[in-house]
Amino acid sequence: MLFGMRALKVLGIESTAHTFGVGIATSSGDILVNVNHTYVPRHGGIKPTEAAEHHSRVAPKVLSEALQKAGISVEEVDAVAVALGPGMGPCLRVGATLARYLALKFGKPLVPVNHAIAHLEISRLTTGLEDPVFVYVAGGNTMVTTFNEGRYRVFGETLDIPLGNCLDTFAREVGLGFPGVPRVEELALKGREYIPLPYTVKGQDVSYSGLLTHALSLYRSGRARLEDVCYSLVETAYSMLVEVAERALAHTGKSQLVLTGGVARSRILLEKLRRMVEDRGGVLGVVPPEYAGDNGAMIAYTGALAFSHGVRVPVEESRIQPYWRVDEVVIPWRSR
């Protein structure tokens, strides 16, 4: 670390999609506070402009509550970290604007954080697994990745829509509402008949758009019970991801697997991964529910790791990056 033995204290801001969060964490892994507020659309899916309006509205309260719960002021933190991407442009701008304001007003360094990498780092911290293969699944992301030669390398990802988006869209179209994943899974557990649906794995990548289209068509045709369509959809979608994860373990020779991201709360996916990992004699870690979805603490902790190794950005250069990939980011705080 560039700052000796003292653990650095960083305030982190998350606003990439439907959640606005503020966390405070140290570079040694202490999570001091984690306060989040989630936008829930009244109808349909997430609308970026509405989500951004929500973030702007709740930001002062969330920030104030986080500081109060942690018992500190902005003056007492060493830096301000913010998720600059990937994510929805209007939402990202809310968090970036607040972070820039705090950095300038209180004279604090500004630390750019990749949202996806923050999911990986908070899961490393909370599971205690040092060098796993990650299955990162959320509404906006689906990838299998692991650390290699200074970066997180992608060993498989969706070629079109993310898994979470696939299930959320299906749920919305059939009237189950938002969030869709738990509601689809609830009906899937009542399914009795598996109906073959498109299973699309291309090399190490997956495709969910065709699966979604066929599942919706099947339901609308009236030829199958909704419970059976949900069961078939979940079974197919998750099995594709498990196949890619197993290939990544085989290719890298690693024995640890971590499930992270919002869909990490899925008991069905967890059980499928657990059986696969146990068959290989490996170890499965799962990020705790409070850190599975988007949250401010993961930005604060990852920001603290980055800042302790000299990462910072001038305010005038802190542009949002809606399509920022994990493999574009050098990871100076990891040697292996």
From Swiss-Prot:
Enzyme class at the top of the EC tree: transferase
InterPro entries recorded: ATPase_NBD (IPR043129), Gcp-like_dom (IPR000905), KAE1/TsaD (IPR017861), Kae1_archaea_euk (IPR034680)
Cofactor: Fe(2+)
Entry binding sites for substrate: 136-140, 168, 185, 266
Keywords: Acyltransferase, Cytoplasm, Iron, Metal-binding, Transferase, tRNA processing
tRNA processing among keywords: yes
A GO CC term attached to the entry: cytoplasm
Entry EC no(s): 2.3.1.234
Reactions mediated catalytically: L-threonylcarbamoyladenylate + adenosine(37) in tRNA = N(6)-L-threonylcarbamoyladenosine(37) in tRNA + AMP + H(+)
Gene Ontology BP terms: tRNA threonylcarbamoyladenosine modification
Annotated protein name in UniProt: tRNA N6-adenosine threonylcarbamoyltransferase
Gene encoding the protein: kae1
